[in-house]
Structures are given as structure tokens and as C-alpha cells.
Amino acid sequence: MTARSEHHPADSAAAPALRVSGLRKSYGEVLAVNGVSFEVASGEILGLLGPNGAGKTTIINTVLAVLTPDSGSIRIGDLDVSRQRSLALARTNFAAVYASLPGNLTVVQNLSFFGLIYRVRFLRRRIEELLGQFQLEALRDTKCGVLSSGELTRVALAKALLNRPRLLLLDEPTASLDPAAARDTRSTIRALVRDTHCGVLWTSHNMYEVEEVCDRVLFLSHGQVLLAGDPRSLPREHGARNLEELFIQLAREPLAHPAERLA
């Protein structure tokens, strides 16, 4: 197993990459997120876990200001998303399997297009850096519509890093990849966190992946945080053999595991 990112939140007094406080969001009479609070420190990979419908996507969409919360606050660094939306989102980026890239554009055209949207300074230089970092030089003039899933994931991650985000949101980033490509992607992201000290909020249903890559995890159910802690020690603390068994227990009997206050 490869080493995780080194995370020492106590070493710095800087604001966390992300701070969510008392977040609530409902759709009509359905309460999707109910008073959720957590932080992602700079240089930390935090896993956001839970069954379908637990509230993960709603949380991500409120952080990205796609949705407006009913109450609560979201801060990216020292910026309040509700008051300083553009500045806060300029420090943020996002990658997911379902966030497809324009297939009629080449790799370089896609990166150029999004780089202009993000107002990236010295864009050509930045694109060349990312092409090298993600081993995309040979594909630079290939249209994204003919790339493999692994190649598309590398382009999507390069796109997400164009603006050197302080906060990176990754929703199932390896879901469409074969094991070798998924392993390489995890290694790349860990190296990026180590080198750039950005914070990462990572969702996944792959518990092996979560144990390998995440510094901490939050378990969600019915829009609430049930458990939070180190993915390697949580199973033992709650009588499960591994993280997958704990996930299944929480998904089936969430009320048996009261929420714990985050440190």
C-alpha cells in the first residue's frame, strides 16, 4: 500500500480549506441535509461516505453554490460563499465521472476553454505543465470524445487543477477506471495534495480506496453525520472487521450509531 498524504493540521493556524457549519437543505418536505458541520484542513483528504440519498451530492452542490442552503454557512479559506461567491469559487474546482468534457474538442482545446473561464494567468504555460504532469502530451491534439475512461479522468483532473485550487471536490473520481488506472489516479492526487497543500473532499463507495487515500472520513445517513474519524481505526472502534462492514452496518441501522462531534 502506498503512503498517504502527510497531514498535520495543527502545524498551521491558517483557515481550513473548507468549513461547513450547521448546513441544512431541503427539497420540499424532504430534509436532504440536516445540520451538517465539518472541516477540511489544507493538505487533508477527507472522505465523504454514505449510501445513495445520504446527502453527499447535496453537500457538494451547496459548496459549489449550485444550490443555496436553507441555513448554515460555508467558508472556503477565509471567504464566505454566500457573500463572496465568485472569489470563493475561484479557489475551488471539481471533478466527477458524470461531469463530461466536450467530446468535439481536443485535450488542449478543452484545457484552453476552461482555463479562459477560470481566468488562469499564463494559461499556455499552465496547460503545458499539466500535460506533462498527467502524461497527456501525446494526446494533446486528440479529441476527448475518443479517449478511454482512464485518459478522460486524467484530462478531467488536469482541468480541475488549472486554477490551482485551494479546495478540490472529487465525486467518485475513479469509478470508471480499471484497478491499475485507479491506483495511478490515487497516487497522482496524493502527490498533488502533498505538493500543493490543497484540501480535498472525496466521495467514494470503494472502501479499500477510502482506507488507502483518505486522512479522515465522515459517514452520512439521512443527511446527518453519524461517525467521523480515521478510516483505519473506526472499524475496530465500532466492532466491525473493516470499513466496508462498518459502512454496511451504518447503512442498515444508522440510529444505532449516534453522531459524534468533530474534533
Whereabouts are the PLM-identified features?
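Conserved ABC transporter NBD signature motif
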Residues: 72-83, 87-88
